[in-house]
């Protein structure tokens, strides 16, 4: 099932694709924004919880401001199949970005495409340390709706976040739901001074 604007036969709800089968989606890329697609075959929540989803980005014709871009798919892992998440993460692997911080440069625009595809829990959130972000709900408007360091999202919601770090250092990002962060949904940005990066490379 594709979120967005398209004909009914491209909605992906009634066209079940069996093992070895295929279905080709064709639609105009509209509207501008960050959109979701996922399996819509019952049991839907189990299929989504086990990874049958993705995201696609439609940029405005005039483009967006140059930025270092990344995507976060916020999800959970039900490892014992009891309908409750045992671990949480961004891009599937719990604690990954805590052990492998994302390297960025100071005073450089960062654009994060954030999708909450979490099942079995009603809401998720994103908290950024050391700076604030402008956020664009679903990215369908080019004017930000707020400036904050905390964002709460229901299931299926998407946001585009834009921010930069003024000072070098290691900065955490995580779910502000303590259970989620303690079970894997936590990471860090490693902001390096751009002049130091240049001198290190030459």
Where are these regions (language model features)?
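Copper-binding active sites and cupredoxin-like electron-transfer domains
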Residues: 1-202
């Amino acid at each position: 099932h594709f979120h967005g604007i398209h004909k009914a036969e491209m909605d992906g709800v009634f066209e079940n694709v069996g093992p070895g089968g295929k279905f080709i989606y064709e639609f105009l890329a509209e509207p501008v924004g960050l959109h979701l697609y996922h399996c819509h075959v019952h049991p839907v929540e189990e299929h989504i919880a086990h990874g049958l989803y993705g995201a696609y980005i439609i940029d405005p014709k005039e483009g967006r401001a140059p930025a270092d871009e990344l995507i976060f798919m916020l999800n959970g892992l039900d490892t014992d199949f009891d309908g409750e998440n045992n671990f949480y993460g961004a891009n599937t692997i719990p604690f990954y970005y805590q052990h492998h911080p994302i390297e960025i440069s100071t005073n450089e625009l960062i654009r994060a495409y954030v999708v909450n595809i979490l099942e079995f829990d009603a809401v998720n959130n994103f908290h950024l340390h050391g700076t604030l972000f402008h956020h664009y709900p679903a990215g369908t408007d080019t004017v930000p709706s707020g400036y904050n360091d905390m964002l709460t999202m229901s299931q299926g919601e998407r946001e585009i976040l834009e921010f930069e770090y003024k000072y070098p250092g290691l900065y955490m990002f995580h779910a502000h739901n303590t259970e989620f962060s303690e079970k894997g949904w936590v990471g860090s940005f490693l902001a390096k001074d751009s002049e130091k990066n240049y001198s290190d490379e030459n």
